[in-house]
C-alpha cells in the first residue's frame, strides 16, 4: 500500500489483521464498495483549532531504577477528542505478555487506571468521543491503547506504516507487536510532502482533524517516526515522541543516564537521522520561543512542567 492524502476510508476490511487504509481513488488506494469525497475531489470541511490540551501519564515504568512514563496528549476539539499516542492499553494490562520480552527492561506498572480509556472516562467523556489518534510511531509503549478506541482514525506517516505493517524488515518484525493492531484500525497514512514549520522542512497540517495539529516527520528512532505539534492556544506543544528520551538532550544542565543513552542507540533505526533531528530540536529549544513547549514521551520532569504550565 502507498501513502494516502490523509483522508479516512469509511469501509471496513474483512481481515482484522490488516488495518483499514484511507484512499484517494487510485487503484491501489481506493476504498472498495463506495466512493468517498476524496475520490470526487471534494475538499473536507474546515475544522477549528483545539480547545484544550490535557497531559496524561498512560504508563508508569521503571527501567533499571530510572522512573519513566508514557506522556500522552488528549486534545479537546469542537469535533471530538484527539489523542497523540496512547501509551499502554487495557489489553496490555490484562495480558502483559502481549507487549513482548522488552517489558522486563521497561517494567511497566500496567495499571488500568493509567490507560487513556480510563482517564478519558474520568474526565466525563466516552471512549467513542475519541475521533482521531495521531501516532509518533508504532512501538508497543505508544500504541497499546489503540484497541480501546476502535472507531478512531489512526494517523501515521506512510514510512512508519510501511516499516511496521506493509513491508517490515526482519528487525522491524521483531520490534513491533502486531497483536496490538489485530482489531483492524482505520489507518490514515500521510506522505512526506509538507511545508516548513519552525526549522523542519516538511511538516504536514492535519486539516481533517483541525487547524492546530501538525505532523512533523522526525525519522531516526524508527523508519517513519514523527513529532506532533498541537496549538494549545497560549502556546504550541511539540510532542517529540522518542526523538529524544531525556531533558538532558535539550541542554547541558542535566546528564542523560547511561542506560537511556544505550537504549537510544540500541533502538535507533538510523542513528544519523536521529542525531540530525536531535540537533534541530536542540536548536529550536535554544531559541526560547515563548509560544513553544518541547516535550518527549518518557521524561517525567518535562511531563510535570507541561502539566504545571498548561
UniProtKB/Swiss-Prot annotation:
<protein>
    <recommendedName>
        <fullName>Probable metallo-hydrolase Rv2300c</fullName>
        <ecNumber>3.-.-.-</ecNumber>
    </recommendedName>
</protein>
<keyword id="KW-0479">Metal-binding</keyword>
<feature type="binding site">
    <location>
        <position position="142"/>
    </location>
    <ligand>
        <name>Zn(2+) 2</name>
    </ligand>
</feature>
<feature type="binding site">
    <location>
        <position position="139"/>
    </location>
    <ligand>
        <name>Zn(2+) 1</name>
    </ligand>
</feature>
<feature type="binding site">
    <location>
        <position position="288"/>
    </location>
    <ligand>
        <name>Zn(2+) 2</name>
    </ligand>
</feature>
<dbReference type="GO" id="GO:0005886">
    <property type="term" value="C:plasma membrane"/>
</dbReference>
<feature type="binding site">
    <location>
        <position position="137"/>
    </location>
    <ligand>
        <name>Zn(2+) 1</name>
    </ligand>
</feature>
<feature type="binding site">
    <location>
        <position position="221"/>
    </location>
    <ligand>
        <name>Zn(2+) 1</name>
    </ligand>
</feature>
<dbReference type="InterPro" id="IPR051013">
    <property type="entry name" value="MBL_superfamily_lactonases"/>
</dbReference>
<dbReference type="InterPro" id="IPR036866">
    <property type="entry name" value="RibonucZ/Hydroxyglut_hydro"/>
</dbReference>
<feature type="binding site">
    <location>
        <position position="242"/>
    </location>
    <ligand>
        <name>Zn(2+) 1</name>
    </ligand>
</feature>
<dbReference type="GO" id="GO:0046872">
    <property type="term" value="F:metal ion binding"/>
</dbReference>
<dbReference type="InterPro" id="IPR001279">
    <property type="entry name" value="Metallo-B-lactamas"/>
</dbReference>
<dbReference type="Pfam" id="PF00753">
    <property type="entry name" value="Lactamase_B"/>
</dbReference>
<feature type="binding site">
    <location>
        <position position="242"/>
    </location>
    <ligand>
        <name>Zn(2+) 2</name>
    </ligand>
</feature>
<comment type="similarity">
    <text>Belongs to the metallo-beta-lactamase superfamily.</text>
</comment>
<dbReference type="GO" id="GO:0016787">
    <property type="term" value="F:hydrolase activity"/>
</dbReference>
<keyword id="KW-0378">Hydrolase</keyword>
<feature type="binding site">
    <location>
        <position position="141"/>
    </location>
    <ligand>
        <name>Zn(2+) 2</name>
    </ligand>
</feature>
<keyword id="KW-0862">Zinc</keyword>
<feature type="region of interest" description="Disordered">
    <location>
        <begin position="1"/>
        <end position="29"/>
    </location>
</feature>
Amino acid at each position: 500500500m502507498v501513502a494516502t492524502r490523509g483522508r479516512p476510508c469509511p469501509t471496513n476490511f474483512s481481515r482484522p489483521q490488516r488495518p483499514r487504509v484511507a484512499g484517494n481513488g487510485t487503484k491501489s488506494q481506493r476504498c472498495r464498495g463506495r466512493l468517498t469525497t476524496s475520490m470526487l475531489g471534494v475538499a473536507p470541511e474546515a475544522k477549528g483549532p483545539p480547545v484544550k490540551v490535557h497531559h496524561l501519564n498512560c504508563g508508569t515504568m521503571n527501567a533499571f531504577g530510572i522512573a519513566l512514563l508514557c506522556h500522552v496528549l488528549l486534545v479537546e476539539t469542537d469535533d471530538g477528542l484527539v489523542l497523540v499516542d496512547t501509551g499502554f492499553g487495557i489489553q496490555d494490562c490484562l495480558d502483559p505478555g502481549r507487549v513482548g520480552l522488552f517489558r522486563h527492561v521497561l517494567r511497566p506498572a500496567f495499571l488500568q487506571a493509567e490507560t487513556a480509556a480510563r482517564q478519558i472516562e474520568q474526565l466525563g467523556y466516552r471512549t467513542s468521543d475519541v475521533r482521531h489518534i495521531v501516532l509518533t510511531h508504532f512501538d508497543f509503549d505508544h500504541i497499546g491503547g489503540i484497541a480501546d478506541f476502535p472507531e478512531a482514525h489512526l494517523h501515521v506517516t506512510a514510512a512508519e506504516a510501511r516499516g511496521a505493517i506493509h513491508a517490515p524488515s526482519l528487525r522491524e518484525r521483531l520490534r513491533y507487536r502486531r497483536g496490538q493492531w489485530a482489531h483492524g484500525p482505520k489507518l490514515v497514512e500521510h506522505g512526506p510532502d509538507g511545508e516548513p514549520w519552525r526549522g523542519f522542512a516538511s511538516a504536514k497540517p492535519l486539516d481533517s482533524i483541525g487547524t492546530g495539529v501538525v505532523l512533523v516527520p522526525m525519522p531516526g528512532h524508527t523508519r517513519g517516526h514523527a513529532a506532533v505539534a498541537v496549538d494549545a492556544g497560549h502556546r504550541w506543544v511539540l510532542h517529540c515522541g522518542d526523538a529524544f528520551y531525556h531533558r538532558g538532550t535539550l541542554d547541558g544542565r542535566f546528564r542523560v543516564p547511561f542506560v537511556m543513552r544505550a537504549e537510544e542507540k540500541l533502538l535507533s533505526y538510523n542513528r544519523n537521522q536521529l542525531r540530525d533531528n536531535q540537533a534541530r530540536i536542540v536548536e529550536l529549544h535554544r531559541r526560547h520561543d515563548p509560544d513553544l513547549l518541547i516535550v518527549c514521551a518518557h521524561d517525567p520532569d518535562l511531563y510535570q512542567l507541561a502539566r504545571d504550565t498548561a
